[in-house]
């Protein structure tokens, strides 16, 4: 089963960022982006699999570029904070044979960090 997951942590509060809406987009060989789906992070700040149900059944991810779009402005508003980045977009390249991609986001009102997780 293939999957793309994320974990959003609020580094200012030192806790998971629950309720951040994450949209997943895909661009294959044509280069045109299409939305695959969107969901909010759970109480632990996680989206266990952003892929649509039919794509989860594949053993590996479709090669190409994937973009995770985090709606951070609405999250910061729930914390009564004005953030600098209303949206955080992270674009990654998936190569042939990758089955799982985990993209954590460490978030604060005035900055963010990401890395390839496991």
Task: List each language-model region with its residue ranges.
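Beta-strand-dominated extracellular/periplasmic modules and repeats
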Residues: 2-91, 95, 102-104
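Compositionally biased low-complexity segments at domain edges in trafficked proteins
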Residues: 98-118
């Amino acid at each position: 089963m293939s999957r793309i997951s994320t974990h959003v942590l609020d580094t200012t509060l030192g806790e998971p960022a629950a309720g951040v809406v994450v949209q997943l987009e895909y661009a294959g060989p044509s280069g045109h982006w299409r939305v695959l789906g969107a969901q909010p992070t759970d109480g632990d700040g996680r989206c266990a699999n952003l892929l649509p149900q039919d794509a989860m059944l594949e053993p590996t991810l479709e090669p190409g570029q994937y973009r995770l779009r985090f709606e951070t402005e609405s999250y910061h508003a729930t914390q009564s904070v004005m953030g600098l980045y209303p949206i955080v977009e992270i674009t990654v390249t998936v190569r042939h044979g990758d089955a799982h991609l985990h993209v954590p986001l460490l978030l604060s009102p005035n900055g963010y960090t990401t890395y390839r997780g496991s």
